[in-house]
Amino acid sequence: MKKNIVILMLLLASVGAMAQEVENPVGKFSVIPRVGVALSNWSNNSIYVSVALGDEIKSKNQAGFMAGADVEYRATEYVGVSLGAYYARLGYRFADYETVESADKKQYWGIKNHHADIDYIQLPLMLKCYVTRQLVAMVGIQAGFRCGDAKFSYEETSLEKDKNGSTYYKDTKEVEGTLIAKRTNISIPVGVSYEYMNVILDARYNIGLTKMENISGFDSPKNSFFTFTVGYRFTL
């Protein structure tokens, strides 16, 4: 029984290795559809609840859907190059906070689910180094083109606090608007991927180079983000 199990494991390992060699041969093109998630944020991006008190709230990573495909050419045993096209929703979010409406009357605004959504078409050009047959390190250049307006939204609730510290919740409304953000975003993606039986797990960090907006007296924010995708290779 043990002998049969060992033989079966060796056969499976051999089949996996053969499939990897056949499905990603040198000198061939392949198409890799992908789907996954992007975790994005803007650097130097804050809101000030109270300028006098210096109450600063920095933005955080926000998750967004992404999907697309790469076309890869395996140039040598160790080098490949790919060009991709993806849809990705990027942006940022803030933790919930309160702003003062009237300190004398102890009236406040409670802000919840404050976030920005920016849709892009991303075009990454990647140079891939095959560290092993399955493990790949990569670096490249990527251009992102904004689709439509950059939007933000949050829920705003009127609050009133009594002298005992109790909070009374009043009207709630949804606030929406558009952001000033450049249409083109250039970044440098670096990452790794692992492939087994044509299934590819891919992780990248995109270093933002473009200043997203120019505000006098403030450091201009840049859009950097992580992407995590799963794909499948089809050799042409």
Identify the function of each model-found stretch:
Residues 1-25, 29, 34, 230-236:
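Bacterial Sec-dependent N-terminal signal peptides
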Residues 2-7, 70, 74-77, 205:
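N-terminal capping/interface segment
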Residues 20-71:
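Short glycine/proline- and aromatic-enriched beta-strand/turn motifs that initiate or cap beta-hairpins
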Residues 26, 74-78, 132, 197-199, ...:
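Outer-membrane beta-barrel channels and translocator barrels
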Residues 29, 65, 79, 121, ...:
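Hydrophobic core residues within well-ordered beta-strands of beta-rich domains
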Residues 33-37, 65-73, 85-87, 123-131, ...:
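Residues on the lipid-exposed face of transmembrane beta-strands in outer-membrane beta-barrel proteins
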Residues 41-62, 89-119, 146-185, 189, ...:
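Extracellular/periplasm-exposed beta-strand and loop segments of Gram-negative cell-envelope proteins
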Residues 79-85:
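Short N-terminal amphipathic alpha-helices
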